[in-house]
């Protein structure tokens, strides 16, 4: 079969043609391995380390009791994952620690006892935690590693670069070394005052000047600068160990009387005692590497040693003298990752330390004869520390479950924030920026756009985390020399000839055979130079180790045996890009996508997109809503299958066999061994974001199943590939101005065929409790509710499954007893006759929120009577799930994968949409102006290649930086044109997609005088393009048989420009307007693009209110959709009303529509009665203003509560200066009438006042001034 139609993948049935040039050397690793491995480490090692740290616990004196912990075990979880999500419980396991108690006074060893240490949240198989019924993810933290760091900063006075050093432990006091411009090296201990470094050296045992100078004589040898001598001379009074100890002690403990023994003890505790000072495994490893100390076992001594301090000072001198380079603190060799296991361990440690303190206190007071381990240990601090971490830590996040990609990304996220990390405010530009050491470790594309940019990142596809917490990435080893006894030599080419005593054993350039290897291996041990080749051996390296090597790119040209084809190779060496001969290359990248995260490597033609837009594309894919009819992309990258596999939403067969039962609920496979594998399917499960997970089988009963085959798809996968959007026919053109500013025009066909329809599920809950006034009751018998409202409720007052519900519909009927007053004699009589029925109850039913609707898909009832475990005072608990089927609508946000996003502005009838020459209307019209300035040309290439794939009936995989190039796309378009010309494309409506008959196309091409088989063969790039252009020019009446290459393209371009008809390779079509039938002026780019519907749906955002809740203080409507609030009419909106002079509108906005309490009640009444709305009164905010002024100590009060507006003739007489009596003033000019105690108000004040002690202050609205000595006031 010709390669035009690639073979369908047997396991999935999807035809996907890959344009990858490079082989997959390393498979994509398990994408959630980091989470799983880390938690397993915590369970097996992390917890053991903690228990060893605190064991044994002794009393304060150390001679009464000793409590030893000798082991621990996790028991079985009490509830399954499913039960926990249903009942809002935490998925956890009980931890039991084996404790042994020793009574020191009698020597009695009590029997080991299993102590319950609380329930520890357990990680699910998908790397998440279920706490209180919701799935959460613990994000890994990226922070500065413990170790020693040498940095250089310029001295402000002299401009000379000076070394500054920090020694950061995992736990303990920091040491900071500084160099002054007078060559004195000083040290700060734990941030206290500086002391010369010579004082610290004397205090740790180098007491004599000569001893100190001898330590540094080899290094401190600059004739101009003598750092150690300058430091000694800086403090001439301190000449021995005791004076140095006392000096340091007096700085660290300023109030205590200094004493040499106490000082020695303090310094030993502070730096050399593992209980108080711990570099940690990582810190010790980093210190040893940086100071090039003799490599001893890392776990051996995690406290400081004298030698460490000396080595640090030696390095400071070397950095100052330019003999050593300073460190880059943003380098990934100096930043490590705290994964889940370590974060939980740190939190657990806090709880254990509190537990230890309580146990020691109890040991001192407990009765020795009656004592048991459980009497000493209080587990509450441990339980609360762990609970606090999972519930409230910045790093424990509500899992983003919008779609499968969002889940994976959330689990692979790295945050530089959180406890012990950076804050948004303090983080500068350098920390946020992309660093060369991120290559292959942290994605340079995927990061948020807001204030967290650069502080939150994502692990690259192939990266992993080593045991010290550093990110590693894989490289292929390049060999140019091998030992003469290495069996790898067989089959390799020699670079130089090998001879022994003048006899040539193997000539240069020859291939080493088995025989020649035997001769070479008998030579004395030596290195054999071979032609440099890339082996299959893969090595994972952290960033600091990688800096030592020269590394070639993944797309370096190799032959089939791994030899380099070029004489000069482009490569990286630390931050430099170099071109080197092959024998200098040490390693080579494993894949072009190793640089990027999962989300970024899902963007086809990423190499043609601007980084800013690629960032948006990567982030928006995570916001795509799973659609009702999931469709994998026409143009993919090949990562879709990996993302779907590790999301946990696709079900794969564990073993080969035959499908014995396939239903919507479960699949049963009968294996070859005769056993049965059962797979349960998730049906309409609500995610954290309200989207829907619904698995459905894609196999049939009786079908043979291979191991690893896809059995069931989820709501966002198709045939085991991620399917977040829809393939649409798009045209880039403007249409009636409806796609102005990135707006999108959609065809009604997409709405009708449910292309962008999605399911959203909401969960509603109600509890019936015991209250002080009586028991709440779930019932159908609700006061003042008509039968119409109860028609969908069952006899218990709970809605039936399948009911269609709308805003304010009752889901669960509930009545609550009202507070009862003293009953009258008549009421007591009624109560005695009719029993409880007559009592006062209020309706507290669960209703659908405003603006929501849907269909009830599930109801769960938990009752104390049925033995369910419910919280205190709760008798019954009902949960109702409501699903909405939302069609796409105007205002919804759509996006491509290249950062091209927009809002739907119109859904046009199919008959009005622009249509192709064959009558096919386009689905989406996008604005062409949105492309050039955004520089995301990937969308255009995707459109072209997608169109060719659409017409020829196959899908495409074009991996990032290793995909289809221009020639390939032009050839694909040319083949689709030739097939259409030959009538080989079946566009019949009963087919879901077009399909092409390759043989028919080849026959037709043969009739035109060309070799059809060659044209449809990928091995002849450019041939299809050339043939299609010649045939097109022939159709246009131009003879181009003698033309080829650039001349042919130039001719086709000229003819196309003159005729305004597109050539076959430009991916354009002549479109007609669906309303008029006339052709558009220019040919339009038409193709197939993958479009996503994002979770920013207009239905969740649109909101309107009539009457509703008000704020208690301001009496203004609440704000926001969640509170059913009003629209804020702010300062700027008021200015707009001023500008239009709409005084009445403005008045009612600020009064009866807002916080004029009496006015709004009257207005409502008037509207109901159909009368004119009365005049507004004083807004409540005026009273708030008065109260605020009073709170400042001003005696402000409203003189007359009865606010009246002055008649117009009164106002005009006031304006002419005719002042009324003061009691008239206070009654008439009212909205701003105030009373105050005032001393000094300027005469030319705009407001007129009466100035006298303790007199009324009247503010009038006219501009005339009130006479100061007017007697009437």
UniProtKB/Swiss-Prot annotation:
One of its GO terms (molecular function) is ribonucleoside binding. Its EC number is 2.7.7.6. It is an enzyme of class 2 (transferase). It catalyses: RNA(n) + a ribonucleoside 5'-triphosphate = RNA(n+1) + diphosphate. One of its GO terms (cellular component) is DNA-directed RNA polymerase complex. GO terms for biological process: DNA-templated transcription. Residues 1252-1273 are annotated as: Disordered. InterPro entries: DNA-dir_RNA_pol_bsu_ext_1_sf, DNA-dir_RNA_pol_bsu_external_1, DNA-dir_RNA_pol_su2, DNA-dir_RNAP_su2_dom, DNA-dir_RNAP_su2_hyb_sf, RNA_pol_bsu_bac, RNA_pol_bsu_CS, RNA_pol_bsu_protrusion. It comes from the Bacteria. CDD domains: RNA_pol_B_RPB2 (cd00653). Keywords: DNA-directed RNA polymerase, Nucleotidyltransferase, Transcription, Transferase. DNA-dependent RNA polymerase catalyzes the transcription of DNA into RNA using the four ribonucleoside triphosphates as substrates. Belongs to the RNA polymerase beta chain family. The RNAP catalytic core consists of 2 alpha, 1 beta, 1 beta' and 1 omega subunit. When a sigma factor is associated with the core the holoenzyme is formed, which can initiate transcription. PANTHER family: DNA-DIRECTED RNA POLYMERASE I SUBUNIT 2. This is DNA-directed RNA polymerase subunit beta. The lineage of its organism: Bacteria, Bacillati, Chloroflexota, Dehalococcoidia, Dehalococcoidales.
């Amino acid at each position: 079969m010709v390669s035009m139609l690639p073979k369908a993948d047997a396991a999935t049935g999807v035809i996907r043609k890959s344009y990858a040039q490079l082989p997959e050397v390393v498979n994509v690793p398990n994408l959630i391995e980091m989470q799983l491995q880390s938690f397993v480490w915590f369970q097996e090692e992390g917890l053991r380390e903690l228990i060893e740290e605190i064991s044994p616990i002794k009393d304060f004196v150390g001679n009464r009791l000793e409590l030893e912990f000798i082991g621990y075990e996790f028991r079985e979880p009490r509830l399954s994952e499913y039960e926990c999500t249903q009942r809002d419980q935490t998925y956890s396991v009980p931890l039991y620690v084996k404790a042994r108690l020793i009574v020191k006074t009698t020597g009695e060893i009590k029997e080991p006892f299993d102590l319950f240490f609380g329930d520890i949240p357990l990680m699910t198989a998908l790397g998440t935690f279920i706490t209180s019924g919701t799935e959460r993810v613990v994000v890994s933290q990226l922070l500065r590693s413990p170790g020693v760091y040498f940095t250089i900063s310029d001295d402000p006075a002299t401009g000379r670069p000076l070394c500054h050093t920090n020694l950061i432990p995992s736990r303990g006091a920091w040491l900071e070394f500084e160099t002054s411009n007078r060559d004195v090296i000083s040290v700060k201990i734990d941030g206290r005052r500086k002391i010369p470094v010579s004082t610290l050296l004397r205090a740790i045992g180098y007491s004599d000047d000569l001893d100190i100078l001898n330590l540094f004589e080899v290094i401190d040898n600059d004739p101009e600068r003598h750092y150690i001598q300058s430091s000694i001379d800086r403090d001439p009074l301190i000449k021995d160990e005791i004076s140095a100890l006392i000096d340091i002690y007096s700085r660290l403990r300023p109030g205590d009387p200094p004493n040499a023994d106490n000082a020695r003890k303090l310094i030993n505790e502070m730096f050399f005692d593992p209980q108080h000072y711990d570099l940690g495994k990582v810190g010790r490893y980093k210190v040893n590497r940086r100071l090039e100390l003799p490599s001893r076992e890392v776990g051996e001594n995690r406290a400081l040693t004298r030698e460490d301090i000396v080595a640090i000072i030696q390095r400071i001198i070397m950095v100052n003298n330019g003999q050593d380079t300073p460190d880059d603190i943003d380098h990934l060799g100096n930043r490590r990752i705290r994964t889940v296991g370590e974060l939980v361990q740190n939190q657990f440690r806090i709880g254990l330390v509190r537990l230890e303190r309580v146990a020691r206190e109890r040991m001192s007071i407990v009765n020795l004869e009656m004592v048991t381990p459980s009497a000493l240990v209080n587990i509450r601090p441990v339980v609360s520390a762990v609970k606090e971490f999972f519930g409230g830590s910045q790093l424990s996040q509500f899992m983003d479950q919008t779609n499968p990609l969002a889940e994976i990304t959330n689990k692979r996220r790295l945050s530089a924030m959180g406890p012990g990390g950076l804050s948004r405010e303090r983080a500068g530009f350098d920390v946020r920026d992309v660093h060369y050491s991120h290559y292959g470790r942290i994605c340079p594309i995927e990061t948020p756009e807001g204030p967290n940019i650069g502080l939150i990142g994502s692990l690259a596809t192939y990266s992993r985390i080593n045991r010290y917490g550093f990110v590693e990435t894989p490289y292929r080893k390049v060999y140019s020399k091998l030992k003469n006894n290495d069996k790898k030599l067989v089959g390799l080419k020699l670079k130089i000839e090998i001879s022994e005593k003048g006899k040539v054993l193997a000539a240069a350039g020859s291939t080493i055979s088995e025989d020649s290897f035997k001769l070479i291996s008998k030579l004395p041990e030596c290195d054999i130079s071979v032609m440099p080749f890339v082996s299959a051996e893969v090595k994972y390296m952290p960033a600091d180790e990688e800096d030592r090597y020269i590394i070639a790119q993944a797309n370096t040209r190799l032959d089939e045996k791994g030899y380099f084809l070029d004489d000069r190779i482009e490569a990286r060496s630390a931050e430099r890009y170099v071109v080197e001969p092959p024998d200098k290359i040490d390693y080579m990248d494993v894949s072009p996508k190793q640089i990027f995260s999962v989300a970024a490597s899902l963007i086809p033609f990423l190499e043609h997109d601007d980084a800013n837009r690629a960032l948006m594309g990567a982030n928006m894919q995570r916001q795509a809503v799973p659609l009702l009819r999931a469709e994998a992309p026409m143009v993919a990258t090949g990562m879709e299958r990996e993302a779907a596999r590790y999301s946990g939403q696709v079900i794969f067969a564990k073993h080969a066999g035959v499908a014995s039962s396939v239903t919507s609920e479960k699949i049963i496979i009968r294996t070859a061994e005769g056993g049965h594998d059962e797979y349960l399917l998730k049906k309409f499960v609500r995610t954290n974001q309200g989207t829907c997970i619904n698995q459905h089988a894609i196999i049939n009963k009786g079908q043979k199943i291979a191991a690893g085959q896809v059995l069931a798809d989820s709501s966002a996968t198709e045939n085991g590939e991620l399917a977040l959007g829809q393939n649409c026919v798009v045209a880039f053109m403007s249409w009636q101005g409806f796609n102005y500013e990135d707006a999108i025009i959609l065809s009604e066909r997409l709405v009708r065929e449910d292309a962008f329809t999605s399911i959203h599920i909401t969960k509603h809950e109600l509890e019936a409790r015991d209250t002080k006034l009586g028991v709440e009751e779930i019932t159908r018998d609700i006061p003042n509710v008509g039968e119409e409202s109860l028609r969908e409720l069952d006899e218990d007052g709970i809605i039936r499954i399948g009911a269609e519900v709308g805003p304010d519909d009752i889901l669960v009927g509930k009545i609550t007893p009202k507070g009862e007053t003293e009953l009258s004699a008549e009421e007591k009589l009624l109560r005695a006759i009719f029993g409880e029925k007559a009592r006062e109850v209020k309706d507290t039913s669960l209703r659908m929120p405003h603006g929501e609707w849907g269909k009830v898909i599930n109801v769960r009832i938990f009752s104390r009577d049925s033995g369910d475990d419910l919280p205190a005072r709760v008798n019954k608990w009902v949960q109702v799930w409501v699903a909405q089927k939302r069609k796409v609508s105007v205002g919804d946000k759509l996006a491509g994968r290249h950062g091209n996003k927009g809002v739907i502005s119109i859904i046009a009838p199919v008959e009005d949409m622009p249509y192709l020459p064959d009558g096919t209307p386009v689905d989406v019209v996008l604005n062409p102006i949105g492309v050039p300035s955004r520089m995301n040309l990937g969308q255009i290439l995707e459109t072209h290649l997608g169109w060719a794939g659409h017409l020829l009936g196959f899908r495409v995989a074009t991996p990032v930086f290793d995909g289809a190039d221009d020639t390939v796309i032009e050839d694909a378009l040319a083949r689709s044109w030739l097939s259409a010309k030959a009538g080989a494309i079946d566009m019949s409506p009963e087919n879901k997609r077009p399909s092409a008959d390759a043989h028919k196309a080849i026959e037709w091409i043969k009739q035109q005088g060309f070799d059809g088989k060659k044209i449809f063969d990928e091995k002849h790039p450019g041939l299809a393009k050339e043939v299609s252009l010649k045939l097109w020019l022939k159709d246009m009446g131009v003879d181009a048989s003698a033309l080829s290459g650039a001349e042919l393209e130039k001719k086709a371009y000229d003819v196309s420009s003159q005729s305004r008809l597109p050539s076959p390779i430009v991916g354009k079509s002549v479109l007609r307007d669906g309303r008029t039938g006339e052709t558009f002026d220019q040919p339009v780019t038409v193709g197939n693009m993958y479009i996503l519907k994002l979770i920013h749906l207009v239905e969740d955002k649109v909101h309107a209110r009539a009457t509703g809740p008000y704020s208690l203080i301001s009496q203004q409507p609440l704000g926001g959709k969640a509170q059913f609030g009003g629209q804020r009419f702010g300062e700027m909106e008021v200015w707009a009303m001023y500008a239009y002079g709409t005084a009445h509108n403005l008045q009612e906005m600020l009064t009866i529509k807002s916080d004029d309490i009496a006015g709004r009640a009257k207005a409502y009444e008037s509207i109901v009665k159909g009368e004119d709305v009365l005049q507004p009164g004083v807004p409540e905010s005026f009273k708030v203003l008065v109260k605020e002024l009073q709170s400042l100590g001003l005696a402000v009060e409203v003189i007359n509560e009865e606010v009246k507006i002055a008649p117009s003739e009164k106002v005009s007489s006031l304006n002419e200066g005719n002042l009324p009596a003061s009691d008239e003033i206070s009654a008439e000019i009212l909205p701003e009438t105030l009373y105050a105690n005032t001393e000094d108000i300027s005469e030319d004040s705009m407001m007129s006042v009466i100035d006298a002690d303790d007199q009324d202050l009247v503010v009038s609205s006219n501009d005339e001034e009130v006479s100061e000595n007017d007697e009437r006031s």
